C-alpha cells in the first residue's frame, strides 16, 4: 500500500494502518541449546545470549523456558511505535549522537544534525543546513540549503492539526535560538529570525524579523551578514 507523505491525512492513515512495534533486547544467561526461537533473533553461545524481538513473543519465550534460564535483563525504549527511526548509514551528513530522526525524512549532503535535535516524519533538510542542539522540526517541515536552525528553535509540524501547507524555510536563512516558526509560515531566502521570536506570518526575503509576534525591523545589511556568517568548515 502506498502513501503520499506530503499529505497530513495520508501520514495519519499510514500511522493508523502500520503494524505497531514494541521491540525489546534481552541479555540472558542460561542454556538455550535446541530451544525453538520463532522469530526472535539470538546471538551468543557458552551460556550467554543477546535476544532481539517483539515484547509479547519474548515474554512468552522467557516464561516457557524459565527452567533453562539462570538470569536475564530486558531493555526497551518504545511502546507500540508506529514509525521507526531513520537508517543513517548511507546519509552523507554529520549526525551527532542523541539526534532523534524518524523514518521518511530527507537529509541533504553535508547537513549537520546536532545532539538532541528532533526531526519528524516527512521533513526535508537541505544541503549544508545545520539543525542545532535541541531544535525541533515538525512533520513535513522543509528547510532549504545552508539554513541555520538555532538551538532550541522550533519549526512547527502540520500533522496535528492537519494542514496542506508546511513550514518552508528557504535557502540561507538563519533562525536564532529558541525562535518558533508557526504552522504554514514561509521564511524568504536570506532572512534572519532573531532569537526568541515567534513568527506567525510569512517573512519576505532579505529581512530581519524580531519579537513576539515577529515584525520586520530592518533589511539584511553587511553588518547583519557578518554576524550571521555560515561556516563551511562545520559542514565538512
UniProtKB/Swiss-Prot annotation:
A Pfam family annotated for this chain is Hexapep_2
Give the E.C. number(s).
Answer: 2.3.1.89
What is the enzyme's main class?
A: transferase
Note the InterPro entries from the entry: DapH (IPR019873), DapH_N (IPR013710), Hexapep (IPR001451), Hexapep_transf_CS (IPR018357), Trans_hexapeptide_repeat (IPR050179), Trimer_LpxA-like_sf (IPR011004)
Q: Would I find Repeat among this entry's keywords?
A: yes
Q: Which UniProt keywords apply?
A: Acyltransferase, Amino-acid biosynthesis, Diaminopimelate biosynthesis, Lysine biosynthesis, Repeat, Transferase
Please list the reactions this protein catalyses: (S)-2,3,4,5-tetrahydrodipicolinate + acetyl-CoA + H2O = L-2-acetamido-6-oxoheptanedioate + CoA
Pathway it works in? Amino-acid biosynthesis; L-lysine biosynthesis via DAP pathway; LL-2,6-diaminopimelate from (S)-tetrahydrodipicolinate (acetylase route): step 1/3
Q: Which PANTHER family match?
A: 2,3,4,5-TETRAHYDROPYRIDINE-2,6-DICARBOXYLATE N-ACETYLTRANSFERASE, ACETYLTRANSFERASE
Q: What does this protein do?
A: Catalyzes the transfer of an acetyl group from acetyl-CoA to tetrahydrodipicolinate.
The UniProt similarity line reads: Belongs to the transferase hexapeptide repeat family. DapH subfamily.
Q: Which HAMAP family match?
A: DapH
Under which name does UniProt file this protein? 2,3,4,5-tetrahydropyridine-2,6-dicarboxylate N-acetyltransferase
Whose protein is this, by species?
A: Clostridium perfringens (strain 13 / Type A)
Amino acid at each position: 500500500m502506498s502513501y503520499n507523505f506530503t499529505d497530513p491525512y495520508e501520514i495519519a492513515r499510514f500511522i493508523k494502518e502500520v503494524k505497531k512495534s514494541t521491540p525489546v533486547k534481552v541479555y540472558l544467561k542460561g542454556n538455550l541449546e535446541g530451544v525453538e526461537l520463532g522469530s526472535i533473533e539470538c546471538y551468543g553461545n557458552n551460556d550467554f545470549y543477546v535476544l532481539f524481538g517483539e515484547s509479547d513473543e519474548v515474554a512468552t519465550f522467557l516464561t516457557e523456558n524459565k527452567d533453562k534460564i539462570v538470569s536475564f535483563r530486558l531493555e526497551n525504549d518504545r511502546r507500540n511505535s508506529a514509525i521507526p527511526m531513520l537508517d543513517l548509514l548511507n546519509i552523507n551528513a554529520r549526525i551527532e549522537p542523541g539526534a532523534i530522526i524518524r523514518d521518511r525524512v530527507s537529509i541533504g549532503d553535508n547537513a549537520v544534525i546536532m545532539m538532541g535535535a528532533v526531526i519528524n516524519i516527512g521533513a526535508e533538510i537541505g544541503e549544508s543546513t545545520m539543525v542545532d542542539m535541541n531544535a525541533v522540526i515538525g512533520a513535513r517541515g522543509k528547510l532549504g540549503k545552508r539554513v541555520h536552525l538555532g538551538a532550541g528553535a522550533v519549526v512547527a509540524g502540520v500533522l496535528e492539526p492537519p494542514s496542506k501547507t508546511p513550514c518552508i524555510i528557504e535557502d540561507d536563512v538563519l533562525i536564532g535560538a529558541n525562535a518558533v516558526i508557526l504552522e504554514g509560515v514561509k521564511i524568504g531566502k536570506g532572512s534572519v529570525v532573531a532569537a526568541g521570536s515567534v513568527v506567525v506570518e510569512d517573512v519576505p526575503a532579505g529581512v530581519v524579523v524580531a519579537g513576539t509576534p515577529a515584525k520586520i525591523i530592518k533589511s539584511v545589511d553587511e553588518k547583519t551578514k557578518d554576524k550571521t556568517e555560515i561556516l563551511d568548515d562545520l559542514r565538512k
